Regions:
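Flexible, membrane-facing loop/turn or short amphipathic-helix motifs
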Residues: 129-130, 160-166
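Generic short beta-strand segments
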Residues: 42-44, 154-160
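A short, structured loop/turn motif at beta-sheet edges
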Residues: 142-152, 179-181
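Short amphipathic beta-strand and strand-loop transition segments with alternating hydrophobic
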Residues: 17-28, 137-145, 158
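Short secondary-structure subsegments characteristic of cysteine-rich extracellular domains
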Residues: 164-187
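Surface-exposed helix/loop patches within compact recognition domains
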Residues: 35-142
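Polar/acidic, low-complexity leader/linker segments enriched in S/T/G and N/D
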Residues: 1-56
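Intrinsically disordered, low-complexity terminal/linker regions enriched in Pro/Ser/Gly
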Residues: 187-231
C-alpha cells in the first residue's frame, strides 16, 4: 500500500491532515483555443480519525482553531470545475504549441492572489468549500513523474475565510497527492470530432501521441475526450 493522499490546513486543529477521497486532474480546451488544467479534490470528514474529546473547547477560539466549527462543515471540496464554473489554470499561449511534458516539468502558478481586500471571487482560479464557501488563491502546483503515466502532485495555496466575513488570505494549505493519472483533455460539446481534431492539432505538440476516447461507450450519445496514448 502506497502513501495516503492528504491535505493539510496549517495550524488548524488537525495537524495530521485530512485524507483525500476524490482527486481528478484533467485538461480542457475552450472556444478560443486556450488550454487549461482543472483540479478537483474532496476530503473525508474532518473529524474522521479524531478520537479526542473536544467538549471542553474554549468558546473564544477563532474559527480556524475550533474543532467544533470544523465539525459543523464536515468536509472540504477544492475545485476549478465542481460548481460548473470554467476556472482552472491556463497552460498555453496561442502563438506556440503546448508540450505537455514540458509543462509538467515546471511548477504551475495561478497568479490570482488579490492585491487588496476587495476582490471578485470570479477572478480566482479555484473555488473552495471549507468552513462554508470560502476563497482560495495563490496556488502553486508541482508534479513528480512516476512509472506508468502516474504522477505525485504537491499543491499549496492561501485561504481566506470569506464565508465568515474575513477577506484576508491569512491561512495556508498543502496537499500531497500520490499516484495520479492525467484524465485527458475535454473540448466544447458544440464541436464536432473533426473540429476538435483541427483545434487540438493546431494547439498541441506531438498530437500523434494522443487519441480520442469515448467518454461513455454504453451510451447512444457520442462524447469524446483527447487522452495520451498508453505506453
Amino acid at each position: 500500500m502506497g502513501p495516503i493522499s492528504k491535505i493539510y490546513f496549517l495550524n488548524n486543529p488537525y495537524p495530521n491532515g485530512h485524507k483525500i477521497v476524490t482527486f481528478n486532474w484533467s485538461g480542457r480546451i475552450d472556444e478560443y483555443g486556450f488550454i487549461w488544467f482543472d483540479f478537483h479534490l474532496k476530503t473525508e470528514n474532518y473529524y474522521a480519525n479524531d478520537d479526542e474529546n473536544d467538549e471542553e473547547e474554549d468558546e473564544d477560539l477563532p474559527d480556524w482553531n475550533s474543532k467544533i466549527v470544523w465539525g459543523n462543515y464536515h468536509t472540504c471540496t477544492l475545485s476549478s470545475n465542481y460548481w460548473g464554473e470554467q476556472r482552472g489554470i491556463r497552460i498555453n499561449n496561442l502563438d506556440e504549441k503546448l508540450d505537455f511534458d514540458t509543462i509538467i516539468k515546471n511548477d504551475l502558478f495561478s497568479n490570482d492572489l488579490p492585491s487588496e481586500h476587495h476582490f471578485d471571487d470570479d477572478d480566482l482560479a479555484f473555488s473552495i468549500y471549507l468552513l462554508g464557501h470560502d476563497s482560495c488563491a495563490g496556488h502553486q502546483i508541482s508534479f513528480s513523474k512516476k512509472d506508468n503515466n502516474r504522477y505525485d502532485i504537491t499543491w499549496t495555496g492561501k485561504i481566506a475565510l470569506t464565508y465568515a466575513g474575513d477577506d484576508e488570505f491569512s491561512h495556508d494549505f498543502k496537499a500531497e497527492i500520490f499516484n495520479v493519472e492525467f484524465e485527458g483533455f475535454h473540448y466544447p460539446k458544440t464541436w464536432s470530432p473533426e473540429k476538435a481534431t483541427e483545434m487540438f492539432r493546431a494547439r498541441l505538440a506531438n498530437f500523434e501521441e494522443y487519441e480520442f476516447v469515448d467518454l461513455n461507450p454504453k451510451s447512444n450519445k457520442r462524447e469524446y475526450k483527447l487522452d495520451k496514448l498508453k505506453q
